[in-house]
From Swiss-Prot:
Protein name: Peptidyl-tRNA hydrolase
Keywords from the named record: Cytoplasm, Hydrolase, RNA-binding, tRNA-binding
Pfam families found in the cross-reference section: Pept_tRNA_hydro
Functional description taken from the UniProt entry: Hydrolyzes ribosome-free peptidyl-tRNAs (with 1 or more amino acids incorporated), which drop off the ribosome during protein synthesis, or as a result of ribosome stalling. Catalyzes the release of premature peptidyl moieties from peptidyl-tRNA molecules trapped in stalled 50S ribosomal subunits, and thus maintains levels of free tRNAs and 50S ribosomes.
Active site annotation, chain numbering: 19 (proton acceptor)
Gene this protein is translated from: pth
GO BP term, pick one: protein quality control for misfolded or incompletely synthesized proteins
Matching InterPro entries: Pept_tRNA_hydro, Pept_tRNA_hydro_CS, Pept_tRNA_hydro_sf
Length: 185
């Protein structure tokens, strides 16, 4: 069994903001596959599907970004999913807009959602699909991450969302993190 979790903040106010890149990526994947998050439990919206013979849980925590670990750990513990079988989709301010990087483990890089997941899973050994949102040039971090992408930026993000569909499919198919990093980084 696998868990794919997209990080973001709940509520329409945050819907299309940069910090909701994880939610937007997840929504893009689910739309492409004709799936919906139809359950509310574990402090998140989620669904469990069978894809190519593999049980997969898709999750969008509803705890706000900084407490995402509560939702991820609750569902992982309930379904007894090992951290190595978890893929977290997150935004990354240290990468250019739309740039993708796969990581198999590691520190949070200052991302509070990832800090929370490391704390609540008790390990850094879970997979991340990081999508760049760039560091703000002339804005505070908070105002940057809580604003939508402009049209030019959105085109780059749309390409990243399309590539993410392939990455998620490869993860579900059992491709290991080294394969994913070699192919997509």
């Amino acid at each position: 069994m696998k868990i794919i979790a997209g990080l973001g903040n709940p509520g329409q106010k945050y819907d299309k903001t940069k910090h909701n890149t994880g939610f937007m990526t997840m929504d893009h994947y689910l739309d492409k596959k004709g799936l919906t998050l139809n359950k509310d439990k574990f402090e998140g919206h989620w669904t469990k599907e069978k894809i190519n013979g593999e049980d997969v849980i898709f999750l969008e925590p509803q705890t706000y970004m900084n407490e995402s670990g509560r939702s991820v750990s609750q569902i992982a513990n309930f379904f007894k999913v090992a951290p190595e079988d978890v893929l977290i989709i997150q935004d990354d301010m240290d990468m250019p807009i739309g740039k993708i990087r796969i990581r198999a483990n590691g520190k949070s890089g200052g991302h509070n959602g990832i800090k929370s997941i490391i704390r609540d899973l008790g390990t850094e050994k879970f997979n991340r699909l990081k999508i760049g949102i760039r560091h703000p040039k002339n804005a505070t971090v908070v105002s940057w991450v809580l604003t939508p992408f402009n049209d030019e930026q959105q085109k780059l993000m749309d390409d990243a969302f399309d590539t993410s569909v392939d990455i998620i499919d490869d993860f579900i198919a059992g491709r290991d993190s080294q394969y994913l990093m070699n192919k997509y980084n």
